């Protein structure tokens, strides 16, 4: 049966079947090939989309804007300073207004309930650009990058997330790996283990797809990985958590030794970015002066041929384009 996602919101990968996820990945690969060939599309011609940002980003904003422009859409950007949502206007009212103006709404912020509320009230597709508990467009880009760098079918691939295994990126990777029958490992300290309800959901899905979902502290879990993944240990505004995070997560830093422990010379390294892989940022340098090394990955890995982080960043644009085309496109 053909996949039809027209009119659907994209809030979490939990809402989509394995076939629907594969459809979006294959569509992204096709759109990427056409862009590389210089074929300009018009699949979003006449469409108006709004980007609603409560939390800043480089990749998400640029990916949505370029993807939309590539296919002929018009884009409006609203941040917390240029929107009254939650201040002088309720989220419900904002959703109803934006739904009258736009064909699709992207939201990037904090609370998953906000993006769900927008989708429930806007009357048009709403796309999750990131919340505190999910980052579904990122997971699509991650898996597309893995597809481009392995000869294995996805259900034979093993992905290991290193570090804080209960953050939003780890969760969206758990969901997509479970849906696609992959082997997911969360390698990190037990005090930062994924929430029980997330694990239970993924293991229930795995019963249908044949996926393996596990987590733990043992370095033996790295063996056979096709991809190692990590994320920063603390974001801006979380400086007070750095001493504790450095103590907890330094044993799970992605180093050359950790990469070698996979025993797979073709294992790729992935990261959602931004990354602290050196001390050339203000935050990393200032923390180094306080004797805290906040690098979650070393340059030995980040700059190695195994690292596909910039291909992965580009793939944000192609997968986001696929989501928009699939849900509001002229197809």
Task: Locate the predicted segments by residue.
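Phosphate/diphosphate ligand-binding glycine-rich loop within oxidoreductases
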Residues: 38, 42-147
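Glycine-rich phosphate/diphosphate-binding loop of Rossmann-like nucleotide-binding domains
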Residues: 53-66, 148-231
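Rossmann-like adenosine-cofactor binding region
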Residues: 204-298
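Positively charged, low-complexity intrinsically disordered leader regions
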Residues: 1-62, 66
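Phosphate-coordination loops involved in phosphoryl transfer and adenosine-cofactor binding
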Residues: 44-49, 155-157, 266
């Amino acid at each position: 049966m053909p996949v039809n996602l027209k009119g659907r919101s994209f809030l979490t990968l939990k809402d989509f079947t394995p076939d629907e996820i594969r459809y979006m990945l294959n569509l992204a690969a096709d759109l990427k090939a056409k862009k590389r060939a210089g074929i300009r599309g018009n699949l979003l011609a006449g469409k108006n989309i709004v980007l609603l940002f409560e939390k800043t980003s480089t990749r998400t904003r640029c990916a949505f804007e370029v993807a939309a422009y590539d296919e002929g859409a018009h884009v409006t950007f609203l941040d917390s300073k240029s929107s009254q949502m939650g201040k002088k206007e309720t989220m419900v009212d904002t959703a109803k207004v934006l739904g009258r103006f736009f064909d699709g709404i992207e939201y990037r912020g904090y609370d998953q309930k906000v993006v769900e509320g927008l989708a429930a009230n806007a009357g048009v597709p709403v796309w999750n650009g990131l919340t505190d508990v999910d980052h579904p467009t990122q997971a699509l880009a991650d898996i597309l990058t893995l597809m481009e760098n392995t000869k294995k079918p996805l259900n034979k691939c093993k992905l290991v997330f290193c570090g804080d295994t209960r953050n939003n990126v780890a969760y969206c990777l758990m969901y997509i790996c479970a849906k696609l029958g992959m082997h997911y490992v969360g390698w990190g300290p037990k005090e930062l283990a994924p929430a029980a309800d997330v694990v239970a959901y993924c293991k229930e899905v795995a019963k249908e797809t044949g996926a393996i979902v596990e987590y733990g502290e043992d370095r033996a879990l790295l063996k056979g990985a096709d991809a190692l993944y990590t994320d920063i240990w603390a974001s801006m505004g979380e400086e007070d958590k750095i001493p504790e995070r450095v103590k907890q997560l330094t044993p799970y830093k992605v180093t050359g030794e950790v990469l070698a422990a996979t025993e797979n010379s073709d294992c790729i390294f992935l990261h959602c970015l931004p990354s602290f892989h050196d001390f050339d940022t203000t935050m990393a340098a200032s923390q180094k002066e306080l004797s805290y090394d906040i690098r979650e990955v070393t340059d030995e890995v980040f700059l190695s041929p195994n690292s596909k982080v910039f291909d992965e960043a580009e793939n944000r644009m192609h997968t986001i384009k696929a989501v928009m085309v699939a849900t509001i496109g002229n197809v």
